[in-house]
Design a protein with these regions (language model features):
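C-terminal capping/gating helix-and-loop segments adjacent to ligand/active sites or protein-protein/ligand interfaces
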Residues: 507-511, 529-589
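Periplasmic-binding protein-like
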Residues: 492-517
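Ligand-binding clamshell of periplasmic/extracellular solute-binding protein-like
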Residues: 38-45, 65-140, 155-167, 230-240, ...
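Extracytoplasmic/periplasmic solute-binding protein
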Residues: 138-156, 188-328, 374-376
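A bilobed periplasmic-binding-protein/Venus flytrap-type ligand-binding module shared by bacterial periplasmic
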Residues: 164-167, 470-483
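Conserved N-terminal structural module of periplasmic/extracytoplasmic solute-binding proteins
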Residues: 3-11, 15-103, 112-120, 140-141, ...
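Glycine-centered hinge/linker elements that transmit conformational signals in sensory
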Residues: 236, 240-247, 281-371, 398-400, ...
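Hinge/lid segment of periplasmic solute-binding proteins
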Residues: 92-162, 168, 180, 184, ...
């Protein structure tokens, strides 16, 4: 193993074959017989086999390459040490732990010299960034990952976070469900504003804003038209209000569900405003799960330069740049967004009960369950919910017993509306909080439900549209047959191109190609389900905290307390940070990886 790595390094130093375009990368002249190891369910395995057959009978003949697939339960370190397969498929969670041990071939030169039909510019940056990591530490002992780092894996697809919701529960509440992207809303539904969930007044003879909407009563006892758009994210206020509408303790037990929602991961809350559980200050990472500093949205038409980095209009400033720009709070062309602490508190409040019982020290909204957060919470006998977060491939589970009874929507997003989203009847508590009704007056002004925007540039005050995704990628183990490196690359570039991805989408995973993901072809894979939402969610998806560094072990020591004691009201955010910030910082201090380009 060491001898083979040394030979590869020596060849790179001496630049062997640099004058030959296709031969420059090395690894040519082998048999062309490629072993491809992957892990997939039986149905997905059949689809991957179909993809392999398509390559062998098509592009593979032109490439002089033949691929044999092997659906294995898992790939271990041992498999990468000796007699490795020519190509492997791994998840983002596995990727970095083997990368820092030098088990992958650097694919940068292969991509630069023989990309075939695989083009990074056709793929979301977060996909490609997830599998870039340098092959050695820099002078400061840091291993750079992300933008600008070496290509060690080629993104193969993603299983993004989405929300499942019960169609029956929504319709019983009088909610009209539509599917319309924000860019098409004005043309297709001129009477609507860009909301995930909104209520329009039905009083004084007001007509429905969309055909098919019916009059029903909202939580405040008003006659309204309720509209749910599953292709526009709900903002924080809309999500908690709609969850409240489906929580028995707020509806005199009139709700058919115990809770409004179940959301296990905080990512779409914190990431949307520009926060994260870690922050890099240019020298080291710190545990920032409850960081109280404001975040910033760029609103200047021509962008703004912060800490030497230029940001375009609509982008959110990264943690490193905001903490190193001393005067950021007074800079022109920036709009403040909530802190990570505010976003995280919003997420925590969803599941913390509204009343203290049995040793609880905190209260919250109490509109979500933190006990059962799997997709079957939609239809469970206890802790039944109206909405539950999950991933798109979990439709397989729901289709078995609940076909036609549920659909898919986007994760939450920070979105600001003119005049705000809520009002209070009496004291400003969540129990007295209600969603503003479009068309009604508040403090003498008619609420229009319009997005709030910068007065000069027109940039809307919205955060990132994001959530976590479970990414997969294709790699060439460095300890595989080096004479077949080029053959292995030719298969990878085809499988990750539109032609290969067109077959792979049959698994339900969102393809890496944005155009294909957002096409009617992928949407049709859902057989009536709103797969368009999954495709949109995937465009802003990021790796979860378990995949930030060498492995997810650094999360384990604090995540249990976070998901149990903190989210159930048995501890406070302040006590959580007292108990776990030091532990998390110690573990983070042991990692050498720096995620370049990530906030």
């Amino acid at each position: 193993m060491k001898g083979k790595k040394a030979a590869i390094a020596l060849a790179a130093i001496m630049g062997f074959g640099a004058v030959a375009s296709l031969g420059a990368c090395g690894g040519s002249g082998g048999s062309g017989e490629i072993d491809f190891w992957y892990s997939a369910s039986v149905p997905d395995g059949r689809i991957i086999s179909e993809m392999i057959d398509a390559y062998n009978n098509g592009q593979g003949k032109e490439d002089g390459v033949h691929v044999t697939g092997d659906n294995r339960g898992s790939v271990s370190r041992t498999d990468l040490m000796v007699n490795s397969p020519n190509v492997i498929m791994l998840s983002d969670e596995q990727f970095k732990q083997f990368a820092v041990e030098d088990y992958y071939l650097d694919l940068t030169q292969y991509y630069e010299e023989m990309p075939g039909n695989y083009k990074e510019e056709e793929i979301p940056t977060s996909f490609t960034r997830a599998f870039r990591i340098d092959t050695k530490d820099d002078a400061n002992g840091k291993r750079m990952a992300g933008e600008g780092a070496a290509i060690q894996g080629i993104p193969f697809g993603v299983d993004p976070m989405i929300y499942y919701y019960s169609i029956d529960v929504f319709e019983e509440a009088g909610i009209k469900i539509i599917s319309c992207e924000e860019k098409d809303l004005e043309k297709k539904y001129p009477g609507l504003q860009p909301h995930g969930y909104a209520e329009y007044t039905a009083e004084n003879g007001a007509k429905p804003p969309v055909e098919g909407a019916t009059v029903s009563e909202n939580l405040a006892g008003e006659s309204v038209y309720k509209i749910f758009n599953n292709l526009i994210p709900m903002n924080f206020e809309e999500f908690r209000y709609l969850s409240k509408c489906f929580t028995k303790s707020y509806t005199d037990n009139d709700s058919t569900t115990d809770y409004g929602s179940a959301t296990h991961h905080w990512f779409s809350f914190g990431w949307s405003v520009g926060g994260d559980c870690v922050g890099y200050d240019g020298e080291k990472y710190s545990f920032t799960a409850l960081d109280s500093s404001a975040n910033y949205l760029v609103t200047a038409k021509d962008g703004v330069t912060v800490n030497g980095k230029h940001y375009a209009a609509g982008e959110v400033v990264r943690y490193e740049d905001k903490v190193k720009q001393a005067d950021i709070a007074t800079m022109q062309g920036l709009h403040p967004l909530p802190s990570q602490q505010t976003a995280m508190q919003e997420f925590i409040n969803l599941s913390v009960p509204r009343d203290k019982t049995g040793g609880m020290v905190a209260t919250g909204y109490g509109v979500a369950t933190a006990i059962n957060e799997s997709v079957d919470a939609l239809y469970s006998a206890s802790n039944k919910v109206a909405m539950v977060s999950g991933r798109i491939v979990q439709t397989t589970t729901l289709e078995v017993a609940y076909k036609g009874q549920y659909d898919i929507a986007l994760p939450t997003q920070w979105r600001e509306y003119k005049g705000g989203s809520v009002y209070y009847k009496g004291e400003e508590t969540f129990g007295n909080e209600y969603l503003k009704v479009i068309g009604k007056q508040y403090a003498g002004t008619v609420y229009t439900g319009e997005l709030d925007k910068d007065a000069e540039s027109g940039v809307p005050f919205v955060g990132r549209q994001t959530g976590y995704g479970s990414f997969s990628a294709l790699m060439i183990p460095v300890n595989s047959d080096s004479s077949n490196y080029e053959a292995a690359w030719k298969f990878i570039r085809w499988a990750a191109s539109e032609e290969g991805q067109r077959i792979y989408i049959k698994t339900g995973n969102v393809p890496n190609q944005s155009a294909l993901a957002l096409s009617d072809e992928y949407a049709a894979i859902g057989s009536g389900l709103n797969y368009r939402a999954a495709a949109i969610a995937a465009q802003g998806a990021e790796i979860g905290d378990w995949a930030y560094f060498n492995n997810g072990a650094w999360v384990d020591k604090w995540s249990g307390n976070f998901n149990q004691a903190l989210r159930l009201g048995y501890t406070t955010p302040e006590k959580f940070m007292q108990d776990f910030a030091g532990i998390a910082n110690t573990d983070i201090g042991k990692v050498s990886i720096v995620m370049n380009g990530r906030w």
